[in-house]
Amino acid sequence: MAPLHILIADADAARAKTLQGSLEDNGDTVVLAPLADLAMTLRRSKPDAAILATEALDRRTIDELRVATKEAPRPVVVFVDRADDTTMRDAIAAGVSSLVVAGLAPQRVRAILDVAIARFQATEATRVELETARANLAERKVIDRAKGILMQQRSLSEDDAYKALRKEAMDRGRKIADVAQSVVSVADLLKR
């Protein structure tokens, strides 16, 4: 795998240095950072991936992870000494790609990170696909609504209503969904 720019946030400075050395031996560049102000640190350093190590995740850290991963999604691996079911669910919901309990060994970190990156990429692809499907469905609904308005107002068949939308879109160099949204907006305005 290509070298990465990795942020390590660890309360234990000696352990952070050990992790840094292990990752740099693989050709990665590493930035060490405190756990405090994690969201801002991630925003500034723009790492390819982040590794957090702490005794236990607290609510503040989970909230900062949620903000940081929402702003700029990236693979995040968290190593903790202990975690309960609720903490694990909250961490995953906050965007953590992998949560490892009592398993921090420097020689395993890159392999765990690689798996987390692969999982993150698969999850991101699924998320993008879902967003695209939702957007397409929303466009389809607007087009159907606009066709209904044209069918009612101009006594057109469904096929002719669609052709009218398509012609208007082509004439104006716009997407059919944009023209349909204009039709719906005007119809809503005229109802008032």
Feature roles, as predicted:
Residues 2-14, 19-23, 50:
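Conserved acidic segment of CheY-like receiver
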Residues 16, 37-39, 48-69, 83-84:
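Conserved phosphotransfer microenvironments
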Residues 22, 109-121:
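Receiver (REC) domain switch/output surface
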Residues 27-35:
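Short hydrophobic/Thr-rich beta-strand motif most characteristic of the beta2 strand and flanking loop
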Residues 86, 104-113:
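C-terminal output helix
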Residues 131-192:
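C-terminal output/effector regions of signal-responsive regulators
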